[in-house]
């Protein structure tokens, strides 16, 4: 008999995470690697765990993630968003908890484009009075 799986897609900056929740003992596998090995920073590992901690389901599901694009921060945010959406499909009663924690909102902040005549998005070339 096939296990019940819950899917969720998360996005952050230029990262996209496709998340599957399967009932298990709480392992998190990202792109075929354990998430302790994949994400080198403890703070970002906590970001990934936030939805599971908020809904008190930390040891109930195995999380299988396929993520691409962006860097560590973007990928961690995308995974968090994807896990939140998948948990919502698993149990709609988590909506209020996840919403209050701000985990269902897509973080719309993106890198600002470089403008012509400037060195970066806002950095102007050095000004010389004389």
Curated annotation (Swiss-Prot):
Q: Which GO terms describe its biological process?
A: translation
A single Gene Ontology CC term: cytosolic small ribosomal subunit
The family database entries (Gene3D superfamilies) matched by this protein are listed as: 3.30.230.10
Keywords from the named record: Ribonucleoprotein, Ribosomal protein
Among the GO molecular function terms of this UniProt record, one is: structural constituent of ribosome
List the disulfide bonds in this chain. Answer: none
Return the InterPro entries for the record.
Answer: Ribosomal_Su5_D2-typ_SF, Ribosomal_uS9, Ribosomal_uS9_bac/plastid, Ribosomal_uS9_CS, Ribsml_uS5_D2-typ_fold_subgr
Which family is this sequence assigned to?
Belongs to the universal ribosomal protein uS9 family.
What NCBIfam families is this protein classified in?
Answer: PRK00132.1 (NF001099)
What this protein is called in its record is: Small ribosomal subunit protein uS9
